[in-house]
Amino acid sequence: MATDSASCEPDLSRTPGDTEGATAEAAKKEFDVDTLSKSELRMLLSVMEGELEARDLVIEALRARRKEVFIQERYGRFNLNDPFLALQRDYEAGPGDKEKPVCTNPLSILEAVMAHCRKMQERMSAQLVAAESRQKKLEMEKLQLQALEQEHKKLAAHLEEERGKNKHVVLMLVKECKQLSGKVVEEAQKLEEVMAQLEEEKKKTSELEEQLSAEKQRSSGMEAQLEKQLSEFDTEREQLRAKLSREEAHTTDLKEEIDKMKKMMEQMKKGSDGKPGLSLPRKTKDKRLASISVATEGPVTRSVACQTDVVTESTDPVKKLPLTVPIKPSTGSPLVPTNTKGNVGPSALLIRPGIDRQSSHSDLGPSPPTALPSSANRIEENGPSTGNAPDLSNSTPSTPSSTAPAAAQTPGTAPQNHSQAPTVHSLHSPCANTHPGLNPRIQAARFRFQGNANDPDQNGNNTQSPPSRDVSPTSRDNLVAKQLARNTVTQALSRFTSPQAGASSRLGVSPGGDAGTCPPVGRTGLKTPGAARVDRGNPPPIPPKKPGLSQTPSPPHPQLRASNAGAKVDNKIVASPPSTLPQGTKVVNEENVPKSSSPQLPPKPSIDLTVAPAGCPVSALATSQVGAWPAGTPGLNQPACSDSSLVIPATVAFCSSINPVSASSRSPGASDSLLVAASGWSPSLTPLLMSGGPAPLAGRPTLLQQAAAQGNVTLLSMLLNEEGLDINYSCEDGHSALYSAAKNGHTDCVRLLLNAEARVDAADKNGFTPLCVAAAQGHFECIELLTAYNANINHSAAGGQTPLYLACKNGNKECIKLLLEAGTDRSIKTRDGWTPIHAAVDTGNVDSLKLLMYHRVRAHGNSLSSEEPKSGLFSLNGGESPTGPSKPVVPADLINHADKEGWTAAHIAASKGFKNCLEVLCRHGGLEPERRDKCNRTVHDVATDDCKHLLENLNALKIPLRISVGEIQPSNDVSDDFECEHTICTLNIRKQTSWEDFSKAVSQALTNHFQAISSDGWWSLEDGTFNNATDSCIGLGTSSIRSIMLGSMPWSTGQSFSQSPWDFLKKKKVEQVLALLSGPQEGCLSSVTYASMIPLQMLQNYLRLVEQYHNVIFHGPEGSLQDYIANQLALCMKYRQMAAGFPCEIVRAEVDSGFSKEQLVDVFIRNACLIPVKQFPVKKKIIVILENLEKSSLSELLGDFLAPLENRSTESPCTFQKGNGTSECYYFHENCFLVGTIAKACLQGSDLLVQQHFRWVQLRWDCEPIQGLLQRFLRRKVVSKFRGQLPAPCDPVCKIVDWALSVWRQLNSCLARLGTPEALLGPKYFLSCPVVPGHAQATVKWMSKLWNAVIAPRVQEAILSRASMNKQPGTGQTASKKYPSQGQQAVVRAALSILLNKAVLHGCPLPRAELDQQIADFKGGSFPLSIVSSYSKKKVESGAWRKVNTSPRKKPGHFSSPTWNKPDPKREGMRNKTIPHLNTNRNSSLSKQQSLENDLSVTLTLDHRLSLGSDDEADLVKELQSMCSSKSESDISKIADSRDDLRKFDSSRTNPGTSAPLNLRTPVPQKEASPPSSRQTAECSNSKSKTEMGVSSVKSFLPVPRSKVAQCSQNTKRNSSSSNTRQLEINNNSKEENWTLDKHEQVEKPNK
């Protein structure tokens, strides 16, 4: 085709010429060009030019098309990548001779082709990129399409379900519509009937209104008449009341006499109980000691481990020696490690002195003395019991039937390691004390033959002395109670979780407790923690070979665990953590025992006993819920002979007898040898066998080791002075003399050996150096010596254990600290991948872990100030301490390091339930709690319940929940004491918390808070006590909340957002959740209730009274919040009226002494309360508040307004004169409200005329709402101070708050009795009581300032006012107030002193010494009160005092007092002449107090220089005396130390004329007015001893007949229960008998 197109090219080029010629010929034929005009020629030319241009365009198009066709057909079939091949082919197949070639130059063709190829390549690449982008879009669209299709299918299915549901709903709705339509028709018919009835009722009401208006007019007239009659009745009523009170008092006296006689008869029958009462604590103490000894007896172990077998009690008298071991536990580790849970090792349980065994039976009941059962019967349900083996101290040979099977066992005990800190001076060696007179070789023979039957016992308990008894009752009781509870549960669990083990596979007894450090344990039980932990239910089982409990020596406090040798869980033998002190026991069947790899003493030559030296291999049993090292692993302990590889070796502490004379015996672990016994030491075979020392016939090097092991400094120094002695000689196990001395903690021996240049780093066959074994045993003084001699502190034993690792396993804080200060490496790992942190966590020792994490060391080795944080800094709930915890020094990699099984330290702590350790680890910022072990388990998966809760709260947001009352309107009353916001709790928001949970938590917290602050006691907010109640007793609940603010965003309960609460609060950085209470702005009073602690229902009632009666006056003692209540009610009314569409205005007017009636008229007129008669009433609501009305006369100020206020209409106008002299008629309209406040307890005189025209609201201090207001207010302040938590009732803050509350109540109670109602105080002054945790002195100082500034001046003014009531009115009374007489001053000072001691200082929780320092700050506290009685003798016949209060009275409290005056000289011969202060006799016995009560009679003397000027003064004196002696008030021994202080006073008849003004008060109920009883006060005070409480309860001032004084004094305790008081109405020096119905002589009971 290319050839054809090429051949056609000339023809195409000639075609235009031929066409043009043909056109010209045709033109010539048609017309002549010459004949054409010029215009025609131009047209012809233009046509021809157009044709030429068209031809050129056609030619160009054809050429381009030809070129494309040519290239496509010539080269389209070939690869364009090789153009030379195409050129060569075209050239060879070129055109023939007749055809003209297209191009003679191939290079030009190549260039053209290349240029074309470049353009095509660019175009193709662009198209390829576009195609790829389109392909990607297409793929994405396909994926989206698939997702949409799936979603469409789901939605379609859901739609079908919804359609089905909707159909069902529609059908139901249709049915309901039909039903409702029928109901609508019925309701319409009923409505018509009701409307008809309503019309009839309206007609009836209109008629009733007319009748009521008429009745109202009649009733107003009748009320006026009734008020007049009431005023007349008042006087008569008070007279009758006084008469009734006298009769009641006399009746009460007679009842008391009967009660006392009955009680005295009962007491006479029972005899004097004083001495038995004193001995009671001792008896109790003895019982406690007995129970402590029971905790370590064989029968206890039997009951726990065996539960079926009976232990034969030995009767050997030699074995009943008492044992006393002083204890000084190491401070580095807890007495009872956390994972032992109070279990006692068999050593502690079995070897006991006989006297303890007796006490055990006395406490637990008799045990039948049967023989020990055979081994076949000793396979108990809980595995082999250590309690069944005969006690070594009771070494009577057992029956043959039990001997042979026991010998067949393969028990083993780990090398006994004792690391008791240096204070056990005398320890019991039961074997040595068994037969002290026998030859040592005979004892050895007995030991051997007896041993076969006692293998488990010997191996575990051979020389174990029993735990010392702690005589401290506090620690004893707490420990016994806690461990008894734990062990009861553990025992029950172990019975069902421990599989049975045959006698053939029984192992040796597990390590027991250290005799020197074992705390007293009560009725301990066996513990198999692995059973409880492994069977937790976590998905995979705990992996084997877990180094959970190491094969290293344990802390100086032994792990108290009586391990069951046969108890296995998932083929894992559980064993206790390693114990202490190196003594060894040899196993009978050693063919099954692997070689020991622990630090041990040299072997004992050729005495084949059941007990071998510490150098011999001994198997041990250990407990671990995680796993164990392989049995062959070298370590400080030897695995038990068991078919299971999961055995954890442990060590048992054996204590040998050491002569206390030796000063070098720093540790009880040393033992005696025959050689040493010859030199004066007490001989003991068992310690010799156990100590690892050689026999007397051994060589010198072995003797050197024995001396070092025993701590015999004298023998050691003698041997070191010999020439040629190898001090570095090692026995077969590699134990050198330095090793033995360091292992036993003999510091002097270590020092001697080091000075003699012994090798400091000589290791045994397992690689343990003396430093290693000293760290393992907790001998920090040896560590200090060894490090000073450059011992290798980073030496690793065969298993990789470093001294620091071993010290952490031991838990000795001092050892760890010394090693850290020496610069040891904390990151060295053992062969199993454990670090020292693993070891510290495995033992549950928090102090060790803190030291590892926080102890910093300077470069030169000296430690910085210890930066280990206190325990309080690690409370996840409490947040950081004020100073902040220090930064840990260990890196995150070390904290998160995992062992071979993938377990980190956090895994170990969580699986064992060591919450404190886990908490410390969680404080490290780099901890990874999600790290998984080889079984794919996280820390949370293996954690106990407590630890799971801790981990769940690890990342919880702690946001305070606060409650706000909004803005508090400023007023004169207590607005400064009210806070706007209060913290009620802290919300823990976890990641999984939902909005529903969040809503419930907020609602529950608010409900609990309202309940807690309004309850009677100090309840915890977490208590379930309030969960059932919806509203508190103050009326607040969740419905009182207006809205809740999450930071700045409003939220309502039940509302949810797309984010979870945790994400939402963290993203918004919410710092607090604020609950806003509904307030007056919303027309509610909830915020007012919360701010003032006045119950909501009472506030709503007050509001109803104001709205209904329009004229209301609030009155009560000063400080009763009258002004605050009035202002808040006015605000609430204002916003309510405004919400209803009425304008409202509040007008406040403060009344003072110069406020006149004209000013009040001006206020009323100016604010449109008084409207001219001609003017129409306004729609505006006006609330007028008149404050401080007590400063003016009510009758003068409001007298002219009474009628217009009562009848508000134009029919009752009132004419008032203006300032310009003109007068006009006004009236009060219905939209005016008048609210007044009076700071006065009661009205007097002419003010009573105003009473009937107003609605009065009395705020009494002894009734709600004022009675409980202060208690609720202070409790809320405490809650806010403690950030939402209520402290315990015994907390000093609670005590000081209760004291402040009791001061207010007792003050008012005493002032009411004194007849001075004007001095009563409302709670306002006490609202500012400071609540400072830990600083009770601040509250006492505040109280002294309040006393000096407010209370004392008011009391002084009130008493002077009463004392001058009968004097001339006017100037005389004023003068008496300004210049009181000497007698009045004495009365005032006496009253202040009595009030201070009875009401203020009584019950103060401060210690006596601190309180004595604070007393000086109170005015009037040091008044000699003997003058109070001075006027009684002068006024015997005056008859001027009245009985003020007859309310029931409570028992007196107890308080020490200043001095009283001389005793009665007439009775000095019969009784003691003086009485010491009660506070000097506080610790005396009760019998001594009772004897004093019989002997002492000190009466008040008279000061004749002081005279009282009126009968009222005498009345005050007698009332003060009555208060001194009254049981209704708190006892003030400060005032009434004398026994017969009131005996000389007379009482005369009441003067009605003078008593009338005083009798306006009503009696105060006992429950509200009286202070707490002495027993309650004593229980709340930490500073009072038991004896003091007993003495305070004996106080009584009741007069009794003379003949029964002795009986009363003997039976004071019973008589003190009488609750009523006998006022001093009888004067035994006068024949006149007042206040009584019969005449007989009465003598006052001695004042006790």
Swiss-Prot record:
Q: What is the effect of changing P599A?
A: Reduced CTTN-binding
| Chain intervals with Low complexity compositional bias | 393-415, 1609-1623
Please name the PROSITE patterns in this protein's record.
Answer: ANK_REP_REGION, ANK_REPEAT
GO CC annotations?
A: cell cortex; dendritic spine; FAR/SIN/STRIPAK complex; glutamatergic synapse; postsynaptic actin cytoskeleton; synaptic vesicle
The subunit structure is: Interacts with CTTN/cortactin SH3 domain. Interacts with STRN, STRN4/zinedin and MOB4/phocein; this interactions mediate the association with the STRIPAK core complex and may regulate dendritic spine distribution of the STRIPAK complex in hippocampal neurons. Activation of glutamate receptors weakens the interaction with STRN and STRN4.
Sites where Phosphoserine occurs are at S1510
Q: What Gene Ontology molecular-function terms does this entry list?
A: SH3 domain binding
Regarding tissue, the record states: Isoform 2 is predominantly expressed in brain (at protein level). In the brain, expressed at high levels in hypothalamus and striatum and at lower levels in cerebellum and cortex.
The modified positions for Asymmetric dimethylarginine read R495
The ranges of region (Disordered) come to: 1-26, 200-250, 322-439, 451-476, 492-608, 1438-1492, 1522-1648
Q: What is this protein called?
A: Cortactin-binding protein 2
Q: SMART domains annotated for this entry?
A: ANK
Query: Locations of Basic and acidic residues compositional bias?
Result: 200-218, 225-250, 1528-1547, 1630-1648
Mutation: P543A; reported impact is: Almost complete loss of CTTN-binding and loss of regulation of spine density
Enumerate the InterPro entries for this protein.
Ankyrin_rpt, Ankyrin_rpt-contain_sf, Cortactin-binding_p2_N, Dendritic_Spine_Reg/Scaffold
Look up the coiled coil feature and give its residue ranges.
Answer: 119-274
Main localization is: cytoplasm
Q: Where do the ANK repeats start and stop? A: 699-729, 733-762, 766-795, 799-828, 832-861, 901-931
On whether Coiled coil is a keyword of this UniProt record, the answer is yes
Q: What does this protein do?
A: Regulates the dendritic spine distribution of CTTN/cortactin in hippocampal neurons, and thus controls dendritic spinogenesis and dendritic spine maintenance. Associates with the striatin-interacting phosphatase and kinase (STRIPAK) core complex to regulate dendritic spine distribution of the STRIPAK complex in hippocampal neurons.
Record keywords: ANK repeat, Cell projection, Coiled coil, Cytoplasm, Methylation, Phosphoprotein, Repeat, Synapse
Which PANTHER family did the record assign?
Answer: CORTACTIN-BINDING PROTEIN 2, ROLLING PEBBLES, ISOFORM B
Q: Which GO terms describe its biological process?
A: regulation of modification of postsynaptic actin cytoskeleton
Q: Where is the composition biased (Polar residues)?
A: 330-342, 372-392, 492-503, 1477-1492, 1548-1557, 1571-1584
